């Protein structure tokens, strides 16, 4: 039977795995699943807004109403607010506690159900909550040590991802600003007209038609597109007689054009 050290190593080894994006569907399923296996419980991880980041169900404990929270990947506001007021791990909460994960309609079915809540911090900020639960049997001190470690590991990953996302946002904003600064007034006018022709972030356009409509030469449009493409703002592909296919890959250009 694995001892506490071996269990800890299994959890901390997750730090060696990368979570590419918080936009990924349920990016923390691996952590929740590993914790559920090691501690023998159900587990889920939510962010500060109550969105589900990952979960693992070893045992059936919930009704259809609660299962819907997991299907929609969003916990109720009332529960999220109550959980956000937990600043240290709250262990072995009974089915009568407001933080129990067991639904009120199943209290008689699981009278000995126990829930443990652990806040997730990173860089001094509250980033989310780790929730584990069992139908019976209290969580031991060893279990709670693993919960604390797990919440720390998730906190580190969340903080790193937020930092990476911020750096990527700054990089894109800088690229847009630099590209805009190279455009003449006529080219800016052309870019605004071009992007308004797109269906969302991509579409087909004919430079000569746009040039005639806004009263500029076709070469101005071509130069503007070339500058945006070299800056990594757009991708384009000639369609021959049908015009040009255009795709915006840095959406910051739309916000910048609102200032034009």
From Swiss-Prot:
Segments of this protein annotated with the region GAF domain: 1-159
Q: Which GO terms describe its cellular component?
A: cytoplasm
Its GO biological process annotations read: negative regulation of DNA-templated transcription
Q: Which residue ranges does the Swiss-Prot or TrEMBL entry mark as DNA-binding?
A: 207-226
- Which InterPro entries does the protein's record reference? ArsR-like_HTH (IPR011991), CodY (IPR014154), GAF-like_dom_sf (IPR029016), GTP_trans_reg_CodY_C (IPR013198), Transc_reg_CodY_N (IPR010312), WH-like_DNA-bd_sf (IPR036388), WH_DNA-bd_sf (IPR036390)
Does this entry carry the keyword Transcription? Answer: yes
- Which UniProt key words apply to this protein? Cytoplasm, DNA-binding, Repressor, Transcription, Transcription regulation
Q: What is its main location?
A: cytoplasm
GO terms (molecular function) for this protein are: DNA binding; DNA-binding transcription factor activity; GTP binding
Tell where it localizes.
Cytoplasm
Superkingdom of the source species: Bacteria
State the HAMAP family in the record.
Answer: HTH_type_CodY
Relate the protein's function as given in its record: DNA-binding global transcriptional regulator which is involved in the adaptive response to starvation and acts by directly or indirectly controlling the expression of numerous genes in response to nutrient availability. During rapid exponential growth, CodY is highly active and represses genes whose products allow adaptation to nutrient depletion.
Hey, which family's this protein in?
Belongs to the CodY family.
What's the protein here called? Answer: Global transcriptional regulator CodY
Give the organism the record lists: Streptococcus equi subsp. zooepidemicus (strain H70)
